[in-house]
Amino acid sequence: MSDLKHLTGLCNIPASNITSILDMAAGYKKKLITPCPSFEPSLQNKRIALVFFENSTRTRFSFEIAARHLGAGTLNFSASSSSVSKGESLSDTIKNLEAMQVDAFVLRHPSSGAADLITRITSKNVINAGDGSHEHPTQALLDMFTLREYFGTIDGLKVIIIGDVLHSRVARSNIYGLITAGAEVGICCPVTLMPPDADQLGITLFTDLDRAIAWADTAIVLRLQLERATGGYLPSLEEYSVHYGLTDERLERVQKHLLVLHPGPINREIEIANNVADRIQPPGYSKSMLLEQVTNGVAVRMAVLNTLLTL
């Protein structure tokens, strides 16, 4: 049983809730990687609405797989084929789905704060699957799970987040969650992509990637939204790649072995080189956890669904 009704972000969430979710996910992961995984149908007869106003591959499919492993049914909502295309508001959409007796909402929306909004108009559980540049809590939880599984603990780890931190909901949730779990967090990006409140977040700030890598135990590389190059934030994608792209040459120069995470999708040869993204074993100065993160995402989202829906 849990006292957690919604998961709209990791800001102010107690460490005990994070630990409980990660511990539960560890149990699910052990079964997931067996040839024929079988789980207790703890969410049998539950109906979960996957309400995605933005495209998604990993998040939407992993929530759907997670729900089915636990015995729940899913309703897949597409904004383009719904009454939203006729002008229906988010509030009316949620109220109508609730009237169909769904038990929970998993929401992805382009507007920051959308998930918090619907917690005020529904009595059902709400899980934020990414809202604008606000938060993406389950991505951060799966990143934290990946780090804990590899290092044994998050406490004391130095984690550098590289890229467009200003617009990144993944960065926000990771900063909040990792600090709560005892990690030291740094961010590395051009000053044009530095959040205005960065110096109030309790993190270390870098604009030089070599220095950031030398400081860190592990790196979370963010997807560069390609429109930033034409929006005045960057001179060009090529220049960004030269100064902030994670490459073997840079790691060798700094002489640093680094565990590398990325939330996906990746822009190959822009924020991360092919060989860094794909290397899962030595030789080399990096170890990629990108596909391991995807596997862990199912386990973590199972834990989140079970935690919230078995109150």
Curated annotation (Swiss-Prot):
Pfam families: OTCace (PF00185), OTCace_N (PF02729). The keyword Transmembrane does not apply. Pathway: Pyrimidine metabolism; UMP biosynthesis via de novo pathway; (S)-dihydroorotate from bicarbonate: step 2/3. L-aspartate binds at residues 86, 169, 223. Keywords: Pyrimidine biosynthesis, Transferase. GO terms for molecular function: amino acid binding; aspartate carbamoyltransferase activity. The keyword ATP-binding does not apply. It comes from the Bacteria. Its EC number is 2.1.3.2. Heterododecamer (2C3:3R2) of six catalytic PyrB chains organized as two trimers (C3), and six regulatory PyrI chains organized as three dimers (R2). Belongs to the aspartate/ornithine carbamoyltransferase superfamily. ATCase family. This is Aspartate carbamoyltransferase catalytic subunit. The gene is pyrB.
